[in-house]
């Protein structure tokens, strides 16, 4: 009887967590779809973005900047789009739109937060010997890289495997 109640609880928990994640993913999907005017530019088929693209980029930066990280982290492939990383990183500069630093995409913060600290638009000057405290966005000759890596697991998946492991023991 305990095992059956545990399975019922686990099933309900998984359903609730999955629906929450789908909701968050669909809001980003909608935000990314709204940026369809940028497709020619970020896929490398155009050398400059059009005004409609820049307007949409500005809207997404204001409403859900964390969704932009999905494009940089390979989210475009989920929509069947091959994103040119160099073009995508150059889009804010080409549109003259301030964005959060790309470094925020690899942290738990997603990319949210204030857009006023974008190094592309407001570089900080530092005194001699202090060094720069800015992170360049979309600059450099080579492809974007990261010194760190992360593996993303969904909480429901971890909970499921934990519950299955627990039930297998007892």
From Swiss-Prot:
Keywords, ordered alphabetically: Cell membrane, Disulfide bond, Glycoprotein, GPI-anchor, Lipoprotein, Membrane, Plant defense, Signal
Protein's name in the database: Non-specific lipid transfer protein GPI-anchored 5
Similarity field: Belongs to the plant LTP family.
Family matches, as Pfam families: LTP_2 (PF14368)
Lipid linkage positions (GPI-anchor amidated serine): 146
Signal sequence interval, chain numbering: 1-24
Species of the source: Arabidopsis thaliana (Mouse-ear cress)
Compartments where located: Cell membrane
Superkingdom per UniProt: Eukaryota
InterPro entries: Bifun_inhib/LTP/seed_sf, Bifunc_inhib/LTP/seed_store, LTSS, Plant_nsLTP
Glycosylation sites: 45, 84, 124, 130
Gene Ontology molecular functions: lipid binding
Gene null: resulting phenotype: Increased susceptibility to penetration of the epidermal cell wall by the non-host mildew fungal agent Blumeria graminis f. sp. hordei (Bgh). Increased salt permeability in shrunken and deformed seeds, with abnormal hair-like outgrowths.
Main location: membrane
Record's GO cellular component terms: cytosol; plasma membrane; side of membrane
Gene Ontology terms: biological process: defense response to fungus; lipid transport; pathogen-associated molecular pattern receptor signaling pathway; response to molecule of bacterial origin; response to molecule of oomycetes origin; response to nematode
SUPFAM superfamilies: Bifunctional inhibitor/lipid-transfer protein/seed storage 2S albumin
Prodomain residues: 147-170
């Amino acid at each position: 009887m305990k095992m059956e109640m545990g399975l019922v609880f686990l099933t309900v928990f998984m359903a609730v967590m999955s629906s929450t994640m789908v909701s968050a993913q669909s809001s980003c999907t909608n935000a990314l779809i709204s940026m369809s005017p940028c497709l020619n530019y970020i896929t490398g088929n155009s050398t400059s973005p059009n005004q409609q693209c820049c307007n949409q980029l500005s809207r997404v930066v204001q409403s859900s900047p964390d969704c932009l990280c999905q494009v940089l982290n390979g989210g475009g492939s989920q929509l069947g789009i091959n994103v040119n990383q160099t073009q995508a990183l150059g889009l804010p500069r080409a549109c003259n739109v301030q964005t959060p630093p790309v470094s925020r995409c690899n942290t738990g913060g997603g990319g949210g937060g204030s857009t006023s600290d974008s190094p592309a638009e407001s570089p900080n000057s530092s005194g001699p010997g202090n060094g720069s405290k800015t992170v360049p966005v979309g600059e450099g000759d080579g492809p974007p890289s990261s010194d760190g890596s992360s593996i993303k697991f969904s909480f429901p998946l971890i909970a499921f495997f934990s519950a299955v492991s627990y039930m297998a023991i007892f």
